């Protein structure tokens, strides 16, 4: 009886279709759409409605989730949680190690350059040898090992030194010490070496009768003089720094006929200075050693770990298939994890401190935060991302598309569809490539119109790199806490997500160029506002502008350039833009910004970059007004399928599935189907029995009048052009070709008897002909 069970047969057919669909295109499945209702039996709807009621909430919302995209979401969450818990705090961690702003900016900015160069390299290696999963896992392992190594670097030694103002004629340590006659001998003391106190020379004048009044913390001075003029060298030891100073030459002037040796006894005076007269200084030799060690670790670690995000982005885009515009829905989980991790770690650091050993007395111990918590959290979260990454599936079937053969033999229909689509679009792509090659792309981007947009993209990346590196540095100078840093991170990421979802609407409303105007204006206001801060917590209102100055600017630039080039060159244009904005822009912002902060201070640098934003805004507006006509701006051509990153890590720059370049084209809106008549809807409704023409002449006459009346009513409403032809025309063609039994009689005439239909076949042919003429 199983063969007679139509419901069981339907279930088997549906499972077979699903299996074929999954084998045919494993990366295009986003959600399982409901199967169309079958019209083979009236009871199918009743039987299908029963299981839907029995499906519980867990099976409906969890079982039907796409597992591949779920893995991508979880990976993005853990990876960017680890990234957000550590990397925004690295500049202030370097500051606590005793590094200068220029050194900190170099350590942060060099990552962008290495990442931009190494990520495409490892992507090509992974594709060439088909070892994407191994490269991904190795890069994530390097993330854990090399970054944890930075957290175990021992800080430089802190020394407590007196703050004695220099006199009018300071002497250096390399100058000889001259001792005048004993009645008024003056010893020109030394200054600390330049590596201990930069630009500070200390001179100590002491008279021998008042030598006990030397105002030093601890000084041991030994002088040995002879009546001759023979130079004598002595070693001067400074217990404060614990260093043995260079030897000095002591020359005694003639004191008459004195033949005996004169020896000055050792005088040691210990006296604690007030805390306002001493300062804490890092040992610069140790700081330089720490800087070189971390620099080597960063260069090696970043080279091997930079490819992880590129590979995961590429796999996620393959999972999405034709639905690449949904990349932002996957990537937003990373931004969510970033904000939550940054806030949690910031609160935890505020309640943990470490004790610092100081070489010297009189200095107040500083309040140092325990940043080892950050590295521990980073290691745990990145390890979780490494475990999740083992579940990624890597398919390299796109490399075999040129052979024209597939391993699956059950999907010929899908392969034929893809071949027909590619064959239809091949001539246009060939003509585009002949008329528009890569050098034409370079010439286009070097023009005034698009070159100015690229410069704005670079400068906005410069500003983002500077803010990412030195915003928390400046807020810490204003007594800002890591909890404040976490709140700032949450606000900025919420702003970026909001701007991401509404950026294309904003571009469509006001245009690409005006969005760039707004971004430059917001940057000007934000930087100048930050430069005049006195309370660190007042920075929060300006953090909501992060979405406009980052996400909206990126979307406008990449959409503007993508609309100007043909589809086959969009990947190249995207790579050039990413290189300028994410690589060169942010790297220069961190490194050049560090040099400026080192010489002018953080507040003055913020103010200067804000004024530079204003100048660039005016120049850019002038260029667009003079050199670019208004008709060049096409607001309708939007590259909505290109993802918008909301982090310093660039997205994939290599298009591995080049056969799907047509998927990046702006989608064509589907036309609405023509309006159907009420009778057509009733005829196509499988829940109602078939309503066909009866053998009775009265029913046939009423049926014809009803059709004519409905057609006349629709014609009066000026909708006749949008109406589908009645299905009776199909009956007319079938009747004309089959004199005995029309094929459509099974649908329109129900389960009528064949003999009755044969009697009325001639009348039905004339009826169909008349209705067809009226339609």
Swiss-Prot record:
Tell me a GO biological process for this protein: antigen processing and presentation of exogenous peptide antigen via MHC class I
Q: Which UniProt keywords apply?
A: Adaptive immunity, Immunity, Membrane, Phosphoprotein, Receptor, Transmembrane, Transmembrane helix
Q: Does the keyword Glycoprotein apply?
A: no
Q: Where in the cell is it found?
A: Membrane
The annotated topology with respect to the bilayer is: Multi-pass membrane protein
Residues that span the membrane, as ranges: 74-94, 106-126, 133-153, 289-309, 338-358, 372-392, 453-473, 482-502, 510-530, 547-567, 582-602, 608-628
CDD domains linked:
MFS_MFSD6 (cd17335)
Q: Which GO terms describe its cellular component?
A: plasma membrane
Descriptive protein name: Major facilitator superfamily domain-containing protein 6
The scientific name of the source species is Mus musculus (Mouse)
Q: Which gene encodes it?
A: Mfsd6
């Amino acid at each position: 009886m199983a063969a007679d069970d139509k419901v069981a047969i339907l279930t088997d057919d549906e499972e077979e279709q699903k299996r074929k669909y999954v084998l045919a295109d494993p990366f295009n499945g986003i959600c399982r759409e409901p199967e169309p209702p079958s019209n083979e039996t009236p009871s199918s709807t009743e039987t299908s409605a029963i299981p839907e009621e029995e499906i519980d909430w867990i099976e409906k919302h969890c079982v039907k989730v796409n597992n591949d995209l779920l893995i991508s979401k979880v990976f993005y969450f853990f990876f960017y949680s680890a990234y957000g818990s550590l990397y925004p705090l690295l500049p202030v961690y370097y500051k606590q190690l005793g590094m200068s702003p220029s050194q900190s900016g170099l350590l942060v900015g060099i990552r962008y350059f290495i990442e931009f160069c190494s990520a495409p390299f490892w992507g090509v290696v992974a594709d060439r040898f088909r070892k994407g999963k191994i490269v991904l896992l190795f890069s994530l392992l390097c993330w854990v090992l090399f970054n944890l190594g930075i957290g175990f670097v021992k800080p430089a030694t802190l020394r407590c030194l007196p703050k004695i103002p220099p006199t009018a004629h300071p002497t250096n340590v390399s100058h000889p010490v001259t001792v005048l006659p004993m009645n008024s001998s003056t010893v020109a003391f030394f200054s600390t070496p330049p590596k201990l106190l930069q630009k500070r020379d200390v001179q100590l004048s002491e008279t021998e009768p008042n030598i006990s009044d030397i105002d030093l913390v601890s000084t041991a001075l030994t002088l040995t003089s002879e009546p001759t003029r023979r130079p004598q060298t002595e070693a001067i030891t400074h217990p404060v720094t614990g260093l043995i100073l260079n030897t000095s030459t002591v020359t005694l002037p003639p004191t008459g006929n004195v033949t005996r040796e004169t020896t000055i006894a050792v005088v040691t005076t210990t006296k604690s200075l007030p805390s306002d007269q001493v300062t804490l200084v890092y040992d610069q030799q140790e700081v330089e050693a720490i800087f070189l060690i971390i620099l080597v670790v960063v260069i090696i670690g970043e080279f091997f770990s930079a490819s992880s995000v590129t590979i995961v982005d590429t796999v996620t885009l393959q999972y999405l298939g034709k639905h690449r515009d949904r990349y932002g829905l996957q990537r937003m989980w990373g931004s969510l994890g970033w904000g939550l991790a940054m806030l949690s770690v910031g609160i935890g650091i505020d309640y943990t401190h470490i004790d610092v050993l100081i070489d010297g007395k009189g200095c107040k111990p500083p309040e140092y935060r325990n940043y080892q918590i950050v590295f521990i959290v980073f290691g745990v979260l990145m390890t979780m991302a490494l475990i999740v990454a083992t579940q990624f599936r890597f398919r390299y079937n796109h490399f075999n598309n040129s052979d024209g053969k597939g391993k699956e033999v059950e999907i010929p229909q899908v392969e034929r569809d893809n071949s027909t689509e590619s064959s239809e679009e091949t001539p246009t792509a060939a003509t585009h490539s002949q008329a528009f090659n890569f050098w034409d792309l370079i010439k286009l981007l070097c023009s005034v119109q698009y070159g100015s947009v690229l410069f704005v993209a670079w400068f906005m990346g410069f500003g983002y790199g500077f803010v990412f590196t030195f915003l928390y540095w400046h807020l810490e100078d204003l007594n800002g806490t890591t909890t404040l840093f976490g709140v700032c991170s949450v606000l900025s990421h919420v702003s970026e997500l909001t701007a991401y979802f509404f950026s294309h609407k904003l571009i469509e409303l006001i245009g690409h160029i005006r969005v760039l105007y707004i971004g430059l204006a917001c940057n000007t206001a934000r930087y100048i506002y930050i430069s005049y801060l006195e309370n660190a917590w007042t920075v929060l209102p300006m953090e909501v502008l992060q979405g406009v100055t980052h996400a909206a600017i990126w979307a406008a630039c990449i959409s503007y350039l993508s609309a100007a080039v043909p589809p086959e060159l969009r990947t190249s244009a995207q790579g050039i833009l990413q290189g300028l904005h994410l690589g060169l822009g942010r790297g220069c912002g961190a490194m050049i910004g560090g040099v400026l902060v080192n010489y002018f201070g953080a507040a003055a640098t913020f103010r200067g970059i804000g004024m530079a934003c204003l100048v660039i805004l005016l120049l850019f507006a002038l260029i667009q007004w003079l050199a670019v006509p208004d008709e060049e701006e096409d607001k309708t051509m939007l590259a909505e399928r290109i993802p918008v990153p909301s982090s310093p890590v660039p997205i994939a720059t290599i298009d591995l599935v080049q056969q799907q370049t047509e998927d990046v084209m702006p989608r064509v809106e589907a036309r609405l189907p023509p309006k159907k008549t009420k009778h057509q809807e009733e005829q196509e409704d499988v829940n109602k029995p078939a309503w066909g023409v009866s053998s009775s002449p009265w029913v046939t006459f009423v049926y014809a009048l009803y059709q004519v009346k409905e057609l006349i009513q629709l014609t009066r409403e000026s909708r006749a052009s949008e109406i589908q032809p009645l299905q009776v025309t199909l009956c007319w063609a079938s009747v004309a070709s089959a004199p005995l039994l029309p094929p459509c009689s099974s649908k329109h005439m129900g389960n009528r008897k064949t003999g009755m239909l044969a009697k009325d076949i001639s009348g039905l042919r004339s009826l169909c002909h008349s209705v067809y003429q009226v339609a």
